Amino acid sequence: MTSLFQAGEAEALLQAAIDGGLPDERGRFGPFGGRYVPETLVPAFERLEAGVKEHLHEPGFQAEFQRELREWVGRPTALTYAGRLSERWGADVWLKREDLAHTGAHKINNAIGQALLAKRLGVERVIAETGAGQHGVASAAACARVGLPCTVYMGAVDMERQAPNVDRMRRLGAECVAVESGDQTLRAAIDEALRTWVTDPHGIYYLLGSAVGAHPYPYLVRELQSVIGEESRQQMLDQAGALPDAAFACVGGGSTAIGLFYPLLAVDIELIGVEAGGTGTGLGQNAATLATGTPGVLQGSYTIILQDDDGQVQETHSISAGLDYSGVGPEHAMLQATGRV
């Protein structure tokens, strides 16, 4: 992937990321990102971008967001020393316990932030997509918190293997819609949510769950999830007395990983993303997008995707419902291309 850049370009791009200059005004992370959407969705994305610029870093919004993270989500989440794993692997292993956040995963950080934004934008209802179900549960909980109706789209295959989360969403007041088109997993759920958003772009807020899709979503999700890396850095200094040699995170769409990695970009730490290996390296056998994919456009963003020689997006395979996505966030594509991750 480094062949995308001429001498010095990768270093300059990475420095821009460290300095907070990415995405640029076009929503791009170097060659990746951007906004490739139907004309009917352009006003909705422009309205969302304007709302993000107006509210996201406004002191009042940030005060409300930080209060919700502290009093409702339960942050900071713990950093736990894994003694037996450390003994087995011959290295000190620390676990950032996002499982201890309200609803059981990191997804709630992004969900409550976007729900607060949706409330400020004056929409009538919220829609969301989900793969493993965690983002659906988080969206349902966040919408209940701010008093907005919520509809969650979920691939039929994922609904079968994640039935307990479907039940949790419904108990939290959300409507769950099974998507039976396409591969019936996360990609199909995102497609269906986008189709619904087109029908009423001013009355509906689309609460996207990962750092994927068209600008400004990759930026918005990164900003809301960066609390993971910010807390981890301080907790390592407080508890271990030093920063780690390496930080690992799983990568599907990439919201967990970008939340951990982004605050650590400027630090001399090896950043390692782990993808779903599935049953092999061939197309359709895995969800290892960065390891086996090629550049292309998927769901509004130019990024790395799993596609055949004709540019047809391929189905994925993984026992993990949260990692079986045919693409990856554009910032991850950039970070891999520069060699930082």
Which residues fall in each region the model found?
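Positively charged, low-complexity intrinsically disordered leader regions
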Residues: F5-G33, E39-T40, E46-V123
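Buried hydrophobic positions in well-ordered alpha/beta secondary-structure cores of metabolic enzymes
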Residues: G34, A78, L95, K107, ...
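Gly-rich Lys/Arg/Thr-decorated short loops/hinges at beta-loop-alpha junctions or inter-strand turns
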Residues: F61-E68, W89-L100, A118, R171, ...
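Short beta-strand segments
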Residues: K96, Y153-M154, E180, L207-A211, ...
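A short, small-residue-rich loop immediately preceding and capping a beta-strand
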Residues: H102, N110, A118-G155, A242-T256, ...
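Active-site-proximal loop->helix
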Residues: R125-I127, H135-A193, G282-G293
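Glycine-rich ThDP/TPP pyrophosphate-binding loop and its adjacent helix/strand module
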Residues: T185-T196, G203, L208-D268
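Active-site/ligand-binding loops adjacent to catalytic centers
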Residues: I190-P216, L220, G273-V341
